[in-house]
Amino acid sequence: MTKSLPKDFIFGGATAAYQAEGATHTDGKGPVAWDKYLEDNYWYTAEPASDFYHKYPVDLKLAEEYGVNGIRISIAWSRIFPTGYGEVNPKGVEFYHNLFAECHKRHVEPFVTLHHFDTPEALHSNGDFLNRENIEHFVNYAAFCFEEFPEVRYWTTFNEIGPIGDGQYLVGKFPPGIQYDLAKVFQSHHNMMVSHARAVKLYKDKGYKGEIGVVHALPTKYPYDPENPADVRAAELEDIIHNKFILDATYLGHYSDVTLAGVNHILKVNGGQLDLRDEDFAALEAAKDLNDFLGINYYMSDWMRDFDGETEIIHNGKGEKGSSKYQIKGVGRRESPTHIPKTDWDWIIYPQGLYDQIMRIKKDYPNYKKIYITENGLGYKDEFVDNTVYDDARIDYVKQHLEVLSDAIVDGANVKGYFIWSLMDVFSWSNGYEKRYGLFYVDFETQERYPKKSAHWYKKLAETQMIE
């Protein structure tokens, strides 16, 4: 039976400033840590990416033509405050006013993120969110944007607090490239959640008319053998690192006893301690019921086995299937069931995980209000033929995830929209330009856009709300 989605559903496309804009030093933009980090460590840079800084009218026209009625955009903090605070860059402010005006002209609702992996370099090199001064700088930046851009009706504080801590201090594939420091992972999560809470409280206290929330990446964690208590424990601990710690901060305003016990175990085994203050919990408590929505980014699930060896993580950045490895001392080891498909980058394709994660939010955090799926999509080595890409695998991936999303709505979850990652092809942080996600193919040499087969499919979906 063909499943459907509600009439008022947002069929969106997602982007991010650093991955799409290019123009990394144009019109007074300040540096971000990624600029030098990519030059030093990778075979690509974010220049010109998809040149969204100049091409946004083209992309928004395509969005309108293909039924995309919402777009995720992030503001580059260092375009507004080149050093993260102090002097405002008027050309950066003007760019975003023009961009939001074009969104509204094209009837594409902008959902605007304040921070998408791109802390200004001056603050990043001073500890990023491990430095509590950064909390103040972020809240001040948020306050400026809320006041300056009243045309924005949907605000998100952060994109993926979890993968920031994970990428910067556990896997080490994001600047500053530190590995296996679990205390820094949790401290980064915590300080960013305090920043989120304070920005949300400020937005509500000022009486602004829009909505505000946060976007979390929530990969579902399963025990490899559900009958083995040690595997169950490994999945629970892995879930605390990536999901539960952050969700508790968002919706409980504190960390549950189970969460804290897990964190304490992980730190006892791996070393380090956390700085959690009374005023932090006052801020979290004050904001826990003020989130208007939760954005869920979901691409994959993981299966965990019991493991008692040393930590070792190998990141598969080049799409060489089977080259990744992930095991954490005192937590567990990822091992994927052989019957479940995975991408060339070892991302496990499991739509049921999205359903389970949505229902988990509904059950464990009943004050969630509503959910948007803010990222979901298939990274692929697209073949460009006949001025298009016949991306049936991408269509199939999105279709399967929309079907379980429809099931979740039927089962009582309040899900109001879906944003495919990504609207057009963009640069991928630790994979470069080979891994494409877009509805629209970008020739990175000429910056021409070409609709893929998936764009035509998505248009029909948006027009009919039928998942076919």
UniProtKB/Swiss-Prot annotation:
Active site per database record: 160 (proton donor), 375 (nucleophile)
Matches recorded under InterPro entries: 6P-beta-galactosidase, Glyco_hydro_1, Glyco_hydro_1_AS, Glyco_hydro_1_N_CS, Glycoside_hydrolase_SF
EC class of the enzyme, as a word: hydrolase
Disulfide bonds: none
Entry's Gene Ontology molecular function annotations: 6-phospho-beta-galactosidase activity; beta-glucosidase activity
Enzyme Commission designation: 3.2.1.85
One of the GO BP terms on file: lactose catabolic process via tagatose-6-phosphate
Pfam family, one: Glyco_hydro_1
Catalytic activity, reaction form: a 6-phospho-beta-D-galactoside + H2O = D-galactose 6-phosphate + an alcohol
Top-rank taxon, per record: Bacteria
Keywords, alphabetical: Glycosidase, Hydrolase
Binding-site positions, D-galactose 6-phosphate: 19, 116, 159-160, 297, 428-429, 435, 437
Pathway assignment: Carbohydrate metabolism; lactose degradation; D-galactose 6-phosphate and beta-D-glucose from lactose 6-phosphate: step 1/1
Gene Ontology cellular component terms for the protein in this record: cytosol
Transmembrane regions listed in the UniProt entry: none
Entry annotated with the keyword Metal-binding: no
Entry's family note: Belongs to the glycosyl hydrolase 1 family.
HAMAP family, sorted: LacG
PANTHER family: GLYCOSYL HYDROLASE, LP05116P
Protein name from the UniProt record: 6-phospho-beta-galactosidase
Taxonomic source organism: Streptococcus sanguinis (strain SK36)
Lineage: Bacteria, Bacillati, Bacillota, Bacilli, Lactobacillales
